[in-house]
Amino acid sequence: MEFSAKQIAAFIQGEIIGDENATVHTFAKIEEGIPGAISFLSNPKYTPYIYETKASIVLVNKDFTPEQEVKATLIKVDNAYESLAKLLNLYEMSKPKRTGIDERAYVAETAKIGKDVYIAPFACIGDHAEVGDNTVIHPHATVGGGAKIGSNCILYANSTVYHDCRVGNNCILHAGCVIGADGFGFAPTPQGYEKIPQIGIVILEDNVEVGANTCIDRATMGATVIHSGVKLDNLVQIAHNDEIGSHTVMAAQVGIAGSTKVGEWCMFGGQVGIAGHLKIGNQVNLGAQSGVPGNIKSGSQLIGTPPMELKQFFKASIVQKSLPEMQIELRNLRKEIEELKQQLNK
């Protein structure tokens, strides 16, 4: 499928600088641009590539001013990255979609399947489960008994939704993710640890995306809730009875212990760890590998273990580099003080 600069500009409400009849049929990174490809520039670090790229069309921010000749046709927009996302979504939507239930899939007789659903070979849909319209379920994905999957969802290969859990509309579950496994609940006894049955569920609201091999545990009682618009990277662990606020994003290997409430629009870097039974406010940013032992107020931007403000963290990091020299200096000072004490006592 081919589109002209004029058509693209109309769709994303952009201003054309160059040939409005330039056409593209594919996407490419700006440093790997080829004729017939559309690319984008949003990070200033990549600016040099715009003068040498072979891409036919490049999306740029409105404030971009070329310092030399640019051969590509430019389309100026408010946000080049956001406009690229719109085009990529349009591109995905234009792809032909399969529908129907493959004869090698297992679908329970009591399951309810919506319109234009595709269920791939070896997928499994349990008793009384529900699958909404236009949802795609890839090979070896499993929807447990009584679980409900909304409309326009994608369950990639080997993803698992346990019994009775709820997945909203427009959700994406990547390969190997597990929704609704038992929470890590055990009661200590003199004979060992006794398992506490986890009788709750997991609720994913609309527009949630869950990365590959990410696990969201079912509640002991009630529900573990992932609110609308949350995006979880690969290998994230959400424990039982957690609640994640709308539009919060978490990078790989974040781990959140049980019964913690995370606010809206938070951003957690990779390997952030948060203790249980805490409350994290709205719009909290945590740098990579931060360890959180206590509550955090809204609007905080922290990093480290325990987490501290960025300026304080960078100051501490500078001091940390000097610790070996400071230790030697401290030993020498102690030695000098002892020598002075001995002289004074004579």
Swiss-Prot record:
CDD domains, sorted: LbH_LpxD (cd03352)
Which SUPFAM superfamilies does this UniProt record tie to the protein? Trimeric LpxA-like enzymes (SSF51161)
Per UniProt, what is one GO molecular function of this protein?
N-acyltransferase activity
- Pathway, per Swiss-Prot/TrEMBL? Bacterial outer membrane biogenesis; LPS lipid A biosynthesis
Example of a GO cellular component annotation carried by this entry: membrane
Quote the catalytic activity from the record: a UDP-3-O-[(3R)-3-hydroxyacyl]-alpha-D-glucosamine + a (3R)-hydroxyacyl-[ACP] = a UDP-2-N,3-O-bis[(3R)-3-hydroxyacyl]-alpha-D-glucosamine + holo-[ACP] + H(+)
| Catalytic residues in the record | H240
Which InterPro entries does its entry note?
Hexapep, LpxD, Trimer_LpxA-like_sf, UDP_GlcNAc_AcTrfase_non-rep
Q: Which GO terms describe its biological process?
A: lipid A biosynthetic process
Protein EC: 2.3.1.191
Q: Which domain of life is it from?
A: Bacteria
Q: What class of enzyme is it?
A: transferase
The UniProt keyword set, sorted, is: Acyltransferase, Lipid A biosynthesis, Lipid biosynthesis, Lipid metabolism, Repeat, Transferase
Cystine pairs: none
Subunit description:
Homotrimer.
Report the protein's function. Answer: Catalyzes the N-acylation of UDP-3-O-acylglucosamine using 3-hydroxyacyl-ACP as the acyl donor. Is involved in the biosynthesis of lipid A, a phosphorylated glycolipid that anchors the lipopolysaccharide to the outer membrane of the cell.
Family the entry assigns: Belongs to the transferase hexapeptide repeat family. LpxD subfamily.
Instruction: Return the protein name.
Output: UDP-3-O-acylglucosamine N-acyltransferase
